[in-house]
């Protein structure tokens, strides 16, 4: 074997995943899979021929030295053991082949190369043979080998002996009574093997085999996926076979009359030559009728000469790489009878190569599969076609016959499968899960198992194909491969035996099929609710028969679980809104926790995009219709991808890039899809040229810049783009960054609040949800099934048309049978009924207000127009239909006309709200949704009337014709003549039959059938003749069930599934007359009509441009809202009855009326309803929150949360502000409300108190930074509220949970008041609390703070009588925070700064007390802000000896809490000058700079104090104790970090040079500073 090229990269692949078999996974017990060797030594694994695979522990490329001394000991010493017995030295160069070039095996190093099962202690007869070559032997006389003697005549050292030093007999599962004993023997066998191996490394982890359960019929077997790898080459090319392996014969006949071909053969254990070629001369052999290879116990590999027939290789029915199986034989080695597969590690370790039974020729799937991801597919296919020597074989016709490659051929290694020896868990299949959360949870578990228990990650599942059944491969004329089991008398008799056995099993299966239900269940057991269990129990005890309603109890399709799976809290989930560094740290932490030695690439790339089994290119293209382009990049795999001639192969895989930091990159009120479009902007020049075609584009703009998505996601392809193809990628990236920078936050007049950012993050999370659910309908379409040609798909469409055109086609028989036929794909079904562009709908998400900068860049004269054929750089002035487009009155762009589109070319900063249809403020679709022609970008027009019209216009423009026809100015589109199938179906629809069509939705739960029914419903609604008629009839007949089904059908194609609320038909039976009397029943019915019509209106506007039905639905919805307002106004007790129903014991009734009330609150079309609700809504919520039922309290909480949102937020604030005018302070009453009841041992706050607390704190944290707060916030920014809160805490005699939340509100209120400088000093000696009623609401003048109030708060903090109370520490900490905010004002601080009690009785004792961590931290922070905000006060502290007392606290006797906080704030004091200097450099333009001369003076005084008093010795003793810990005491890491930071500041900052010079005079101090300095980089800035 040639040596390796040192220039080749050894970076391991990061895209390998498990097999995609649907077979059942078996639990894999944990084994010690750590590689053997010295700790810290790189563990390399010899992987495949011609390349080198670095194991999981190697993160750098391994390069061999240029000059290697082959006579050195390092070269001759074996260190690694290859798969076939090849030994490698430390340079990974093969130096010896065990059993080939040595007359005898070396002691301690020669593994036995015979089959493990040949000498097994199993009572079952041996059924496997070794494929290992025999020893060197110059005598080629095959007569020496006896046919029925498997081991006796072989060279002794090649026999498998249990006494061998390295390997012992592999356990047989049939030799044990139970599985646990078998597991124990496997573990013991592995331990002995690893102990005997010593320093020699195995290339794989020691795998295992599993006994399979018995099955009774072939129909239950699932096809297993061969774990082929595009990146793999073979183990067996690691060495060349010697002459002893290949036996050349001259068609001589042995003693038994066997004939041999001229092809090279390998010897089997029974002495027979393993010639399996179809081109051999063995047709005279009567005992080998079907030309199978060595039936019975003879299994091996034939390596044919290039001119001598097929290259066949034995392959087991059991796929050991997946734990799945497919077999039909009943021989002793078949996995059906419970024995493990012989293709397991037993054959791998003992033989050095694979040994598979009951199989036929295996060939590399990469050469034949139709959906190959490999670009070398066509080249290999042509090679194989040239070298194909046998086409008569059925297996060859299927594309699996072996080529004529010899072992020396350049592509011979492609026939090997390196993954056969490793058991790999089955990957979860997406179709088996009802929700994405279930699938994600299963994928995480699977990935954890594979990573932690597999040394070399398995290949990508997209590279696998399904194997044909064995019954299809076996033939009677001898042309096929050997697929039979172990034969009778070594001949092909087992084929007949297997056939009769299968016939008996088929009869048994038919009898058992009616006795048991065969159900396909997910891998993870779904959640079963209590109602489902009760229903199943009733069903099992009933006498229900399978009649015409048997679809209700389908045994093939299970109902989805009623509860959605949720990931555990401990599982980290990838969020699109996370920053890159934070996301990377989380993934890195997960990898370290799962496997300490795994350092490969990211393995969870598929979490954002579930794998598609086949046809992924078409699926990604379909996704471009609803989603922004998911960042895809073509990965160039240079580590182990190479052809035999040395050429590189480039693969393209869809890999999601790391998520974008939207929070830092975007303004909170910037529109999401505009930004996503901007990311795809190539250059500014291409923008101007692309938008040139927008002058004449329809009503409001053209489509010259519409993009088209590609399957690989390489970028946005602008039509009309010119002049950008010659630029490099770096130039494009730079210009794109410049374009984004022009639209950055700095160019916008934006002051975002926390609430706005929170709302914007919610929008991004909603967008992420679209990514997760957008793949859920892929399996219904034709591109999900590989192997269909366009002609075959066209024939399927013609079949549907023939069924529709057949006589007697009606609704009950024809339509129902058509939608239930699973052979018809959904997309072909829709094409038959003229629904070519019917795709997923992206539901509306809340929009943020548009931001319009006042800067407009003159575009000047533009270049020639784009696709629209117009010229000029400006935008046309056609009348737009979207009211959200901002049109400045006097601004002009280009030709001086106001813009009609928010997308301004050539770097303008104008942004506005998203494109809309007919003024809907809450409805827009993502890029190129079913109506659009491509992705949304800044060059797309947004003012067309409907997406359907935009799609037609874009198609016309792309064809190069005019967007306007020559007659009447109407849009020129494709002919809209309905097809014959559409006319036939619409002829069946009338006012009576349409509700029957809707009932089909209740008769099936199959996703494909529901999709077809929904498509037909949409076809009816988009019809100009039928649409309005059917909806009008439903509303006239008050058929709410049909209206519900109609909303369900039209929302079926949502990108995110919609959970519709069902109208409770049995509500009359559940409610008492006191609730359901009067107008309640009619209002509830109208609310559901309003709700369903809203869903229909939003989606119908997307799928249809029929003005008649759109106008009717809109008017009907408004009419329902007006009638609700009239009923509400006439019945004054209606709101009382709704809340009475909310408090009922029944959860169903409470949830139903909660839904009704929420719809009424959000009903903006009826001002009457809004005004009536505002009267008593808050009072009823307050009463409902005291209910004893949890569902009623949930209703109160949900309603209160809605009141905190727009537009009800102002109403809630105004209600509390009104109570202040009445001197009631209702929100304070709500804050202090406690739970009632004698059973409560410890009083706790009520629900209304918790809700009010969250509301008040949220308002205080999100108040805009305006100079003067808005009047609406006066309900909380009020001096009366301030003193009431303060007195409620200071004068409290017993702390409760209510006091705790009041203290939190008080601390937040003080922060806001201090931020706006609303505190003022008062010389009054009276305590605050009594406020002039005439001025109590005038907060603009400030809240008067007297010294008496300050001393009351300080006295409260000094009081220790309530320290044992559980709430005391938190309450005191909040009050200390409030005191810090009060003392920030210089006037207020000057009134008490010279009071001795402030320091002697409060500050110094509190700094010394470390019992309460947060309290102590805030006390030291108070000391820090005294110096920072009040210049010159440090001199007073020094003169008054208070500073010396504070420094005395820092000693070895102080606790870690005190020392940590003291060091932290002292470090901040020393670095105060540098901090303020850096802050001045980064300040925003127009803001005042900080005068640093006062800080420099204070820091200088502090440094002089340290030098004069020799204070550094205190810190040196602490440092010495931490660094010279000889007592074994655990070191506080936070304290260690703070002391090193303190040292670093002294040695680094220029302001501390005086202290540094004084410190360096002491050798011990100098040593400590030098040691700390070595911890940091010299160039690192502080």
UniProtKB/Swiss-Prot annotation:
The record's account of how the chain is modified after translation: Phosphorylated at Ser-359 by PKB and PKBR1 is induced by chemoattractant.
TPR repeat segments: 4-37, 166-199, 742-777, 1080-1113
Gene Ontology CC entries for this record: cell leading edge; cytosol; plasma membrane; Ras guanyl-nucleotide exchange factor complex
One annotated GO biological process: positive regulation of Ras protein signal transduction
Keywords from the UniProt entry: Cell membrane, Membrane, Phosphoprotein, Repeat, TPR repeat
GO terms for MF: protein kinase activator activity
Keyword Cell membrane: yes
Quaternary data: Component of the Sca1 complex composed of at least gefA, gefH, scaA, phr, and the protein phosphatase 2A subunits pppA and pho2B.
The protein's name: Sca1 complex scaffold protein scaA
Gene coding for it: scaA
């Amino acid at each position: 074997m040639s040596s390796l090229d040192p220039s080749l990269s050894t970076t391991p692949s990061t895209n390998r995943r498990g097999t995609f078999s649907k077979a059942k996974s078996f639990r894999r017990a944990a084994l010690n899979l750590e590689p053997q060797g010295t700790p810290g030594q790189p563990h390399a694994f010899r992987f495949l021929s011609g390349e080198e695979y670095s194991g999981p522990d190697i993160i750098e490329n391994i390069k061999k030295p240029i000059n290697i001394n082959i006579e050195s000991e390092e070269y001759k010493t074996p260190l690694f053991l290859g798969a076939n017995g090849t030994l490698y030295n430390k340079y990974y160069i093969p130096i010896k082949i065990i059993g080939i070039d040595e007359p005898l095996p070396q002691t301690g190093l020669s593994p036995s190369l015979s089959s493990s099962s040949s000498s097994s202690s199993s009572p079952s007869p041996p059924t496997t043979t070794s494929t290992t070559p025999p020893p060197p032997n110059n005598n080629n006389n095959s007569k020496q080998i006896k046919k029925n003697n498997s081991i006796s005549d072989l060279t002794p050292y090649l026999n498998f002996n249990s006494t061998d030093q390295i390997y012992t007999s592999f356990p047989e599962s049939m030799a044990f009574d139970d599985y646990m004993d078998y597991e124990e023997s496997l573990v013991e066998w592995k331990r002995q093997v690893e102990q005997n191996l010593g320093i020699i490394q195995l290339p794989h982890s020691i795998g295992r085999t599993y006994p399979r359960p018995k099955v009774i019929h072939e129909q239950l077997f699932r096809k297993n996926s061969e774990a082929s790898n595009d990146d793999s080459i073979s183990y067996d090319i690691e060495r060349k076979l010697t002459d002893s392996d290949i036996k050349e014969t001259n068609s001589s006949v042995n003693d038994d009359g066997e004939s041999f071909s001229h092809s090279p053969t390998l010897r089997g254990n029974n002495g027979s030559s393993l010639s399996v070629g179809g081109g051999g001369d063995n047709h005279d052999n009567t005992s080998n009728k079907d030309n199978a290879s060595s039936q019975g116990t003879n299994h091996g590999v034939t390596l044919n000469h290039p001119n001598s027939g097929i290259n066949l290789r034995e392959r087991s029915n059991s796929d050991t790489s997946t734990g799945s199986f497919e077999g039909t034989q009943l021989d002793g080695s078949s996995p059906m009878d419970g024995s493990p597969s012989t293709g397991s590690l037993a054959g791998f370790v003992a033989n050095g190569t694979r040994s598979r039974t009951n199989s036929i020729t295996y060939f590399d799937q990469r050469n034949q599969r139709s959906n190959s991801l490999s670009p070398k597919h066509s080249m290999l296919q042509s090679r194989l076609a040239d070298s194909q020597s046998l086409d008569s074989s059925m297996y060859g016709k299927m594309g699996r016959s072996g080529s004529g490659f010899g072992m020396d051929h350049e592509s011979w290694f492609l026939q090997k499968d390196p993954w056969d020896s490793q058991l790999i868990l089955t990957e979860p299949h997406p179709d088996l899960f009802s929700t994405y959360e279930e699938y994600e949870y299963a994928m995480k578990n699977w990935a954890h198992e594979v990573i932690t228990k597999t040394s070399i990650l398995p290949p990508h599942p997209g590279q696998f194909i399904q194997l044909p059944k064995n019954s299809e491969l076996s033939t009677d004329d001898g042309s096929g491969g050997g697929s039979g089991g172990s034969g009778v008398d070594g001949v092909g008799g087992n084929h007949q035996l297997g056939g009769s056995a299968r016939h008996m099993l088929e009869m048994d299966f038919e009898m058992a099929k009616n006795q048991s239900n065969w159900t396909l269940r997910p891998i993870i057991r779904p959640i079963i609710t209590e109602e489902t269990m009760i229903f199943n129990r009733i069903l099992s005890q009933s006498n229900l028969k399978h009649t015409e309603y048997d679809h209700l109890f389908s045994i093939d399709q299970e109902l989805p679980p009623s509860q959605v799976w949720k990931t555990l809290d401990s599982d980290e989930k990838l969020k699109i809104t996370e920053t890159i560094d934070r996301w990377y740290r989380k993934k890195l932490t997960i990898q370290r926790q799962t496997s300490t030695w795994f350092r490969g690439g990211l393995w969870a790339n598929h979490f954002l995009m579930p794998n598609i089994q086949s046809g992924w290119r078409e699926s990604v293209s379909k996704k471009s219709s609803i989603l922004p382009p998911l960042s895809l990049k073509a990965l160039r795999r240079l580590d182990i991808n190479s052809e035999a001639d040395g050429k590189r192969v480039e693969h393209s895989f869809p890999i999601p890039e790391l998520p974008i930091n939207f929070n830092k990159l975007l303004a909170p009120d910037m529109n999401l899809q505009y930004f996503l479009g901007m990311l795809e902007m190539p250059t500014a020049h291409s923008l101007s040229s692309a938008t040139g075609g927008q002058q004449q584009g329809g009503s409001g703009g053209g489509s010259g810049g519409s993009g088209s998505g590609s399957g690989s996601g390489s970028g946005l392809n602008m039509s009309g783009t010119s002049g950008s193809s010659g630029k490099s990628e770096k130039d494009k990236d730079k210009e794109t960054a410049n374009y984004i920078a022009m639209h950055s936050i700095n160019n916008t007049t934006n002051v975002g609040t926390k609430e706005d950012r929170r709302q914007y993050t919610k929008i991004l999370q909603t967008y992420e949800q679209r990514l997760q659910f957008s793949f859920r309908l892929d399996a219904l379409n034709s591109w999900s099934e590989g192997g269909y040609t366009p002609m075959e798909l066209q024939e399927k469409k013609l079949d549907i048309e023939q069924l529709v055109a057949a006589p007697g086609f009606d609704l009950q028989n024809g339509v129902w049978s058509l939608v239930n036929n699973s052979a018809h794909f959904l997309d072909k079904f829709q094409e038959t009924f003229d629904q070519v562009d019917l795709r997923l709908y992206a539901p509306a998400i809340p929009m943020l207000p548009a931001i319009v900068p006042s800067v407009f860049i003159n575009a000047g004269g533009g270049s020639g127009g784009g696709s629209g054929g117009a010229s000029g750089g400006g935008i046309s002035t056609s009348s737009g239909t979207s009211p959200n487009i901002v049109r400045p009155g006097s601004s002009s762009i280009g030709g001086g006309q106001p813009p009609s589109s928010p997308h301004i070319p050539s770097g303008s900063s104008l942004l506005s709200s998203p494109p809309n249809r007919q003024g809907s403020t809450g409805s827009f679709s993502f890029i190129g949704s079913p109506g659009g022609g491509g992705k949304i970008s800044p060059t797309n027009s947004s003012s067309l009337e409907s997406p359907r019209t935009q799609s037609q216009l874009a198609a016309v423009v792309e064809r190069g014709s005019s967007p306007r026809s020559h007659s009447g100015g109407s849009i020129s589109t494709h002919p809209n003549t309905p097809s014959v199938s559409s006319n036939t179906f619409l002829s069946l629809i009338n006012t009576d039959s349409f509700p029957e069509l809707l009932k089909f939705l209740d008769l099936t739960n199959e996703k494909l059938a529901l999709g077809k029914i929904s498509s037909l419903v949409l076809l009816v609604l988009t019809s100009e003749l039928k649409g309005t008629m059917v909806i009008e009839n439903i509303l006239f007949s008050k058929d709410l069930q049909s209206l519900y089904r109609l909303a369900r059908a039209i929302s079926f194609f949502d990108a995110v599934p919609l959970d519709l609320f069902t109208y409770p038909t049995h509500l009359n039976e559940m409610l008492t007359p006191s609730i359901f009397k009067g107008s309640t029943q009619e209002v509830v019915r109208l609310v559901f009509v309003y709700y369903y019509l809203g869903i229909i209106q939003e989606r119908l506007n997307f799928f249809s441009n029929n003005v008649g039905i759109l106008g009717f639905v809109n008017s009907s919805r408004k009419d329902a809202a007006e009638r609700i307002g009239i009923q509400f106004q006439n019945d004054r007790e209606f709101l009382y009855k709704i809340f009475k129903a909310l408090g009922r014991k029944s959860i169903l009734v409470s949830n139903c009326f909660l839904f009704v009330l929420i719809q009424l609150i959000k009903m903006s079309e009826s001002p009457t309803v809004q005004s009536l609700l505002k009267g008593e809504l808050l009072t009823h919520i307050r009463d409902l929150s005291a209910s004893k039922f949890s569902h009623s309290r949930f209703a109160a909480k949900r309603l209160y949360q809605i009141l905190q949102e727009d537009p009800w937020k102002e109403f809630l604030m105004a209600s509390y502000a009104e109570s202040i005018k009445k001197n009631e302070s209702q929100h304070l009453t709500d804050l202090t409300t406690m739970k009632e009841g004698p059973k409560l041992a410890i009083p706790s706050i009520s629900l209304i108190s918790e809700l009010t607390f969250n509301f008040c704190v949220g308002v205080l944290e999100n108040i805009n930074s305006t100079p003067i707060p808005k009047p609406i916030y006066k309900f909380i920014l009020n001096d009366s509220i301030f003193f009431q809160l303060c007195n409620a805490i200071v004068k409290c005699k017993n702390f409760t949970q209510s006091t705790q939340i009041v203290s939190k509100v008080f601390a937040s209120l003080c922060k806001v008041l201090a931020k706006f400088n609303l505190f003022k000093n008062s010389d009054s000696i009276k305590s605050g609390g009594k406020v002039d009623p005439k001025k109590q609401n005038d907060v603009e003048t400030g809240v008067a703070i007297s010294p008496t109030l300050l001393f009351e708060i300080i006295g409260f903090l000094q009081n220790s009588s309530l320290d044992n109370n559980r709430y005391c520490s938190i309450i005191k900490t909040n009050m200390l925070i409030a005191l810090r905010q009060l003392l920030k004002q210089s006037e207020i601080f000057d009134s008490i700064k010279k009071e001795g009690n402030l320091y002697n009785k409060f500050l110094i004792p509190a700094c010394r007390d470390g019992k309460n961590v947060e309290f102590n931290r805030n006390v030291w922070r108070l000391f820090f802000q005294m110096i920072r905000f009040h210049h010159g006060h440090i001199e007073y502290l020094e003169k008054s000896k208070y500073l010396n007392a504070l420094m005395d606290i820092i000693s070895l006797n102080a606790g870690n809490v005190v020392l940590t906080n003291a060091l932290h704030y002292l470090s901040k004091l020393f670095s105060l000058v540098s901090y303020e200097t850096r802050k001045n450099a980064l300040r925003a333009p127009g803001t005042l700079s900080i005068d640093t001369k006062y800080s420099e003076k204070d820091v200088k005084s502090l440094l002089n104090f340290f030098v004069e008093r020799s204070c550094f010795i205190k810190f040196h003793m602490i440092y010495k104790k931490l660094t010279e810990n000889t007592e074994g005491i655990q070191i506080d890491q936070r304290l260690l970090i703070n002391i090193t930071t303190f040292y670093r500041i002294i040695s680094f900052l220029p302001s501390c040079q005086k202290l540094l010079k004084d410190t360096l005079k002491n050798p011990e101090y100098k040593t400590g500073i030098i040691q700390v300095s070595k911890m940091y980089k010299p160039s690192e800035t502080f």
